């Protein structure tokens, strides 16, 4: 195989072309590729961080929802407890009022019974005196009648 001048010229031209590409063309291409790799790596890292943050946020939201449910249940339980307390207080007050009304009724009945009893004593005493007057046949003086009535009322 003969090396002639054309082949040597082509080798020199190719070497200059390779040197030119390595010096001026290759670095910007490599730089663009590396920058694109960094950009993709950053995007993947950001996506992974966002996914992790979304997962963490989801857990926090679920915890907050559970806490809100627990708090709501506590409020409902407290309201039910307070309602029951109020109902119990109302029952106690109603029972006390009922007892008071019954006592007042008994007192009124007792008072009325005593009044009627006193009226009855006076009428019985008056009838006894009237009967005694008829038996004796004469009228005893008024002061003596009142004394006798008072004594009879006290005895009855």
From Swiss-Prot:
It is a single-pass membrane protein. GO terms for molecular function: proton-transporting ATP synthase activity, rotational mechanism; proton-transporting ATPase activity, rotational mechanism. SUPFAM superfamilies: F1F0 ATP synthase subunit B, membrane domain (SSF81573). Keywords: ATP synthesis, Cell inner membrane, Cell membrane, CF(0), Hydrogen ion transport, Ion transport, Membrane, Transmembrane, Transmembrane helix, Transport. It is found in: Cell inner membrane. The chain crosses the membrane at residues 7-27. CDD domains: ATP-synt_Fo_b. One of its GO terms (cellular component) is plasma membrane. Disulfide bonds: none annotated. Its main location: membrane. It holds the Pfam family ATP-synt_B. Gene3D superfamilies: F1F0 ATP synthase subunit B, membrane domain. Belongs to the ATPase B chain family. F(1)F(0) ATP synthase produces ATP from ADP in the presence of a proton or sodium gradient. F-type ATPases consist of two structural domains, F(1) containing the extramembraneous catalytic core and F(0) containing the membrane proton channel, linked together by a central stalk and a peripheral stalk. During catalysis, ATP synthesis in the catalytic domain of F(1) is coupled via a rotary mechanism of the central stalk subunits to proton translocation. F-type ATPases have 2 components, F(1) - the catalytic core - and F(0) - the membrane proton channel. F(1) has five subunits: alpha(3), beta(3), gamma(1), delta(1), epsilon(1). F(0) has three main subunits: a(1), b(2) and c(10-14). The alpha and beta chains form an alternating ring which encloses part of the gamma chain. F(1) is attached to F(0) by a central stalk formed by the gamma and epsilon chains, while a peripheral stalk is formed by the delta and b chains. This is ATP synthase subunit b. The gene is atpF.
